[in-house]
């Protein structure tokens, strides 16, 4: 099937989905969850093929772990689907409205976007997460996963499509591009006749490629060069716990701390405490000259930070450390090197906290809390399809409402404008 045909089929499926009740959609999602569990053995057989190829191609242990499915992980994915069932359906919600002077009733009603294209890398769980979020919001979806997950994605999409057919819903509501040729990504990005939004989930290179080549609106995000600024009035022991959590809990995530900013006045006191606190966490430091001289005395594994490393999403236990004179210099650094994802200040000053929140341009700004909270589940949104760092349409974790738009509905009594 050509990509154009896939787009046409998705558009037709979206028209049907837009007419479904919440109960119809939840029934389909329930069957998807059940079938994931019932067919877990088949899924694991296909996933094993991806794992074998990954090992043969020398992929890192971290990537292989993201690729790996187990019975427990499949059960967890099914549990996530059931959680989506429990969420309120935003479609059809009346956002606001009123009665106009003419007597016309005006309502702003939440509706699906239509067809969403999602391009992502080596995470088979994303296949199910995205498909079910789109179904819950009456959107059709065209998936293009990384070549590393090709076997896993094929079987997962088949399970979903079979479940849709069992409930009388169009299987083309969820489709996948399984050819690894990158030209298909480029073709998808030009399919504006059928696709209403593109959501890339991956590194900076993928986001930039989509932004440069798409004729469809693209949600940019997911790349997190996140900062924590330790201001001189911060409670240092509590600050150490926040930094530890933000850096070491899950280093590969986009909400992980990458650059630590420390106020100059407390650097000689605070940095030795930091090294002692993280000594068993295998953190590698990349420091500016002032921080380097302090960290070397603590026998830390440290090197001089390079300018390009300040723009790097490490995705590992590497940590940049930069000394700043004051909050103005901290904000200036974040403005220059941040990716508008998640930024934090640790301080006892309400005035400086307010200044930081007001002036730092990011999807999520934290006062005395870890950047790791930037997550749909943590924000009470249920699941998320991505984290947007742009300002138009959606910003931050994208839950169900972010997969919708709205239309104005006017109801009159054969009313004409005077």
From Swiss-Prot:
Gene3D superfamilies documented for this protein: Aldehyde Dehydrogenase, Chain A, domain 1, Aldehyde Dehydrogenase, Chain A, domain 2
One Pfam family from the record: Aldedh
Enzyme class: oxidoreductase
Top-level taxon of the source organism: Bacteria
Keywords, ordered alphabetically: Amino-acid biosynthesis, Cytoplasm, NADP, Oxidoreductase, Proline biosynthesis
EC nos: 1.2.1.41
Reactions performed catalytically: L-glutamate 5-semialdehyde + phosphate + NADP(+) = L-glutamyl 5-phosphate + NADPH + H(+)
Localization, UniProt: Cytoplasm
GO process terms (BP): L-proline biosynthetic process
Matching InterPro entries: Ald_DH/histidinol_DH (IPR016161), Ald_DH_C (IPR016163), Ald_DH_N (IPR016162), Aldehyde_DH_dom (IPR015590), G-glutamylP_reductase_CS (IPR020593), Glu-5-SA_DH (IPR012134), GPR_dom (IPR000965)
Any GO CC annotation of this UniProt entry: cytoplasm
Protein function: Catalyzes the NADPH-dependent reduction of L-glutamate 5-phosphate into L-glutamate 5-semialdehyde and phosphate. The product spontaneously undergoes cyclization to form 1-pyrroline-5-carboxylate.
Family note: Belongs to the gamma-glutamyl phosphate reductase family.
Descriptive protein name: Gamma-glutamyl phosphate reductase
Organism: Histophilus somni (strain 2336) (Haemophilus somnus)
